[in-house]
């Protein structure tokens, strides 16, 4: 049994080792748009702001650029029981987000290309593991870039095909220095 496992491990590791050593792999250019470039600039750790707008110790969001610059990965409420992930990518001309919710669904939202200059406004564009006419889910979100160190996030959740009053509270975040 141990020999079989060793053979399987070697067979699985060979392609990974070969890929890791080949520095000549040609990648196509990464699709982009202005809103996606804005999202990339938000990479870092974001903490809750106190009532005066000053940073606290409460980490609320960790944003990083990944996958060769083709995706932005956001972890919301890291380490908490309600931790969630949102992935931002470019699909054709559009910035899109898939939100992996603590509710077990994955709403997809598309950024409105006509959003104000300091905002990215996302609207529901489908999803997995949800029926938008019945199930509770995130339905829209607005990210406001106040300045390089301050952002605000407001969302609207839906339940039963209508806005829900108990979801997606607003957040005021400060970039951790």
Regions found by a protein language model. Give the residues of each.
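Bacterial N-terminal signal peptides that target proteins for export
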Residues: 1-7
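General secretory precursor processing signal
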Residues: 7, 11, 171-172
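Hydrophobic h-region of N-terminal signal peptides that target proteins for export
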Residues: 11-18
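Hydrophobic small-molecule pocket/channel-lining residues, especially in calycin-type beta-barrels
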Residues: 21-177
């Amino acid at each position: 049994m141990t020999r079989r496992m060793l053979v399987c491990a070697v067979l699985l590791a060979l392609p990974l080792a070969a890929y890791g050593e080949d520095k000549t792999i040609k990648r196509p250019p990464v699709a982009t748009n202005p809103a996606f470039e804005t999202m990339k600039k938000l990479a870092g750790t974001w903490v809750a702001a106190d009532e005066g707008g000053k940073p606290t110790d409460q980490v609320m969001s960790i944003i990083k650029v990944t996958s060769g610059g083709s995706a932005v990965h956001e972890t919301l409420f890291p380490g908490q029981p309600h931790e969630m992930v949102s992935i931002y990518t470019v699909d054709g001309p559009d910035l899109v987000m898939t939100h992996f919710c603590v509710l077990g669904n994955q709403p997809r939202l598309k950024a409105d290309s006509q959003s104000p200059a300091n905002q990215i406004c996302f609207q529901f564009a489908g999803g997995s593991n949800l029926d938008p006419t019945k199930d509770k889910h995130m339905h829209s979100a607005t990210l406001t870039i106040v300045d390089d160190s301050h952002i605000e996030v407001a969302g609207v959740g839906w339940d039963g095909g209508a806005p829900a009053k108990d979801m997606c509270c607003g957040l005021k975040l400060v970039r951790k220095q």
